């Protein structure tokens, strides 16, 4: 485990194991100040960090779930092929199960991965619409 991985919460450390994602040999982590993005095969899972800032509040599971649902609803309008679902994460932080059953311990926005080099093209398509 790298030094950076040791600083991650147990849930994120555990979700870096590729066996959580069928047919995946490796998982890449991208962090922002408000989320963790787990890139796994054809999919990306965005998990909100439990933070409260002047411009947003992700401090509780309920608020993070609501924000995930809002993100899906808003972004699906322009990118329905990318924004797929809000999925629950179940079991325990040390042994999580994606899209399992029971009471969720966390939520993630499930997205289809895309080639980042296509972003300028996607922006232009959007600008052509407005």
Residue ranges and their predicted role:
Residues 7-130:
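Conserved ATP-binding subdomain of kinase catalytic cores across diverse folds
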Residues 1-3:
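Short, Lys/Arg-enriched N-terminal segments with co-localized hydrophobic residues
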């Amino acid at each position: 485990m790298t030094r950076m991985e040791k600083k991650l919460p147990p849930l994120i450390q555990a979700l870096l194991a590729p066996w959580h994602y069928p047919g995946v040999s490796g998982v890449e982590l991208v962090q922002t100040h408000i989320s963790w993005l787990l890139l796994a095969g054809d999919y990306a899972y965005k998990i909100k960090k439990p933070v409260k800032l002047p411009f947003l509040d992700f401090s509780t599971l309920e608020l993070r779930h609501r924000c995930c649902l809002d993100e899906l609803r808003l972004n699906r309008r322009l990118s329905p092929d990318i924004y797929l679902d809000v999925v629950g994460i179940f079991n325990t932080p040390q042994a999580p199960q994606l899209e399992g059953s029971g009471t969720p311990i966390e939520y993630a926005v499930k997205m289809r991965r895309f080639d980042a080099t296509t972003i300028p093209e996607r922006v232009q398509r959007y600008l052509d619409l407005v």
